[in-house]
Amino acid sequence: MESAPGAETIIGGKRRLYFAGTSYFGLHGHADLIRAGVKAFQKYGTHSATSRAGFGNNPVLLEVEEQLKEFFGETDAAYFGSGYLSSLVLAQSLAEKYDAVFVDEAAHFCIADSAHSLGKPVYRFRHRDAGDLRRKLQTKLKPRQTPFLMTDGVFPTYGYIAPVPDYLDVITPYKGLIGLDDAHGVGVLGPNGRGTYEHFGVASEGLHLAGTLSKAFGGHGGFIVGGKKLIAGARTTAGAYIGSTPTPTPIAAAAAKGIEILRSHPEMRDRLRKNVSLVKAGLKKLGVPIDDTPVPIVAWSTGSAEKMKKVQRLLMNRGIAIAYLKYIGAPSEGVLRVTVFSTHTVEHISRLLKELATAL
């Protein structure tokens, strides 16, 4: 890749239509984000070179947290150097409130790594299976223990959404907690872009949200949002927050601008949803199995790794980049994966579908 990711991206020296990655709103190359980053670079240098527990705070990092509070309608937020740390910071912040951890078997690496670092029993349940979660709670949880469920909000390979309302029904009798790493849901799902919880319209004191600014928002770094007590816990007890260097200040400045833009322009989500509907309808006509949700991810397997690699090469030669990957939740032969952006035009989408019809 030799340009910012967007609907048209330079790859291998050629401008191609880009239907991969996670720049759902094309903000990574947005002029306002770049200007904000350059201005911060000139004033603050590369980064604070120390933890936020020391002298690492600066007005830019605090502005990101203010923007997060406004975007998610929460009373406080904690922002740190990597989205990979989000689940860990959340789990460490809540550590005194649960006794055992239950993890979706297809959870992202960062969730699994976090769960196994906590020093508490960890149990895996079948992918997106509330019934199996119930059985695991019944057989593994000891009397008077509180469970903590850790899962993706939107799973990265296929874009499937975790059945949060079902999980809430199952875990509430145990007074359990849910920690949702909504990396692919925030900014995208829900009327205000607040993610999977808002998509389902669920709310509970036991629901907790972690996410990243590296996808929809065009920036970088992880975050958790919630009440004052939760965030105070992150700042005083979460080693992953206390002991890490914050996001480089220029990138944080760009992230703050990205949050502001996405909050101020809900029509960007409207365009994304229209494009998602257009792509999914077209792929369905080609016989591709479709999960009919607003998630801008479609992945499928033809059953043959060689065939899928060939399809990817054919499209690349025709000036269109889609992904072939072996990732979490994918079968052994891998999948073809298409990602949709709000910045794709009808012409871009028509060309993608036309070339796929020939290649498949």
Describe every region a protein language model picked out.
Residues 90-109:
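Conserved PLP-anchoring active-site segment centered on the Schiff-base-forming lysine
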Residues 35, 39-82:
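Conserved N-terminal alpha-helix of the aminotransferase class I/II PLP-enzyme fold
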Residues 31, 35-39, 43, 66, ...:
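PLP-dependent enzyme catalytic core of the Aspartate aminotransferase-like
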Residues 198-233:
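Active-site PLP attachment segment
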Residues 27, 270-277, 284-319, 334, ...:
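Conserved PLP-binding catalytic core of the aspartate aminotransferase-like
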Residues 1-46, 176:
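N-terminal "arm"/small-domain region of PLP-dependent enzymes with the aminotransferase-like
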Residues 245-265, 271, 275, 284:
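Structural motif of enzymes handling amino- and sulfur-group chemistry
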Residues 123, 127-180:
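Active-site phosphate-binding strand-loop segment of PLP-dependent enzymes
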